[in-house]
Amino acid sequence: MNKIKFFAILLLISLALGFRDTGLSGLQFQAYAQSGNAHEVVFTVPVGENGIHYEGVDIPEMLTWGPAAFTVAPDGSFWIADTVGGRLLHYSPAGNLLGKIDLKGLIVGATDVEAAKAGIWVLDQASMPPKVIRLAEDGAALGKYDLPPGLHLEDGLTGIALGNRGELLVEREGDAYVTQFTDATGNPVEAMTTNGYIHKGGLFAANASGLNSLTPKRGTILAGQLHIEVETEYDLGGMQILGFGPQDDFFVALEELALNPDTGLQVDQTVRHYDALGKYMGVARVPIAEQYTYVQQGLAIGPDGSVYVLATRPDRVEVWRLVFTQSLDSILYEPPLTSNPAEIHDESFGVKACVSRNTIISTASSYRNNSKYLSSTNINGACSGRQKPRYLGGAGTYSSVSYDWGGFDTVSGFNGYMYPNTYKAGDINTTEESCSRGVDCSGFVSRTWQLTSKHSTCTLENISTQLPSKNDMLRGDIYNKCGDHVVLFSSFGSDGMWDYESTTYNSYDRVVYIYSKWTRFSGYNPRRYNNVCP
């Protein structure tokens, strides 16, 4: 998602003409009418050497993740970031593999990609500091630029986009803050930040009122001189400008939220199409619940005006072309009319002193802000079965605490194991090695909650209570998915949330403080530690 494409765009649908101009077959239209979720599979990419890779598959207490981004080039070809495999994959409009670019040694983790006349831009959010690189189609490096302070992970870095002249833009908190980083030729310029995108001299932005506001189902789209009010059936978690067309029409991605007490957070992501005068033209649904793994940048607009989705499956990924209509049926959970709000009980028997939220967040911050010199032995020394965290290069001072599967180290403990001892920093392999130190996702939350023993993502549920509403989240609460991953909630963001977590996601391989959109936490449960102070 987060794609700004200034390409020609065709009208996708016209109900007024009885779908005569849509190009849909009778079978395609029937499927669409029945499900409200129509799409065309453009092509399929396998898993493996000739395709994409996943990490953490079928491993308890390990997040499964895969490709982070894709984009459509001006010639209609597709670029897919095989983030786990450390590659860019280039496909023709028909899905034929045109080439592969090996990114190992250039970046830590490819988290966004854009195709411009100046070259192929790749965002690396996992490196220290984060950076962008510019590549030729044959993989030759044309430029490599560190992002300055203010454009880092802890500042809300979420993606990159292209301006209408081909200049590179850096996005924070979606489209809440957009900074021009280069000119159209790819040369860095003095940073200029706006609260949205500039298109033909006008400011375009989409903002939800906020889950903790008095109007959580409302939002506003600013389109130059136009103000478009949006009201949704369910809570509006976020909105973002997706892209523009040649007639100044534009697309907006929305996320509606609901909490199912049995299955966790539900996210309905849709794309709305507006003409230059702000007239609503149609809507299409992105099947978030069907995704095998979350794709951070999973929407793109092509030169033919189509909206594409990168859909993940256990044995493949598919590139879909969305089909638009005038309206969609709701798919989110509706609580029974007779239901009463759930109460939050303190079930921590025998515990004398509660843990304050300030203590929880202070502990989390101490992991993220830790600074430690790591020797070549700490980084590359012998440690059978260990897989080194990807952000670690040569000897030097690194911030944070490394991810270590099964790890439960305190900050001071980790630092002491590094020096004067000579243990190894982190292990992203899924076996416990006595020679490596660090902390995994549930070990990190266990420490922030001041627990004396490590809990798993599943046993954390034994000492916490599920919240009756996603809007009730406070600092120090968690979003948890038993057997998979857990994050520590910090605050609501512009169109998503801020959290602390120890994770291998996006090749971070350490404790990070990041901003994410709600789609990332589809299927997670909001929970509160039973012994947190009121």
For every predicted segment, state its role.
Residues M1-A8:
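Bacterial N-terminal signal peptides that target proteins for export
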Residues A8-G18:
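Bacterial N-terminal signal peptides
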Residues T22-I344:
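Eukaryotic scaffold repeat domains enriched in small/polar residues
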Residues V319-S330, S490-F492, R527-P534:
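Short beta-strand-to-coil "C-cap" segments at the C-terminal boundary of structured domains/repeats
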Residues S339-P341, Y515-P534:
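Low-complexity, Gly/Ser/Thr/Pro-rich intrinsically disordered linker/tail segments
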Residues E343-D440:
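N-terminal capping segments
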Residues R437-S446, Q466, V486-F489:
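Mobile, glycine-rich extracellular loop/lid and propeptide segments
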Residues L451-V512:
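...with weaker cross-activation on analogous glycine-rich loops/strands in unrelated enzymes
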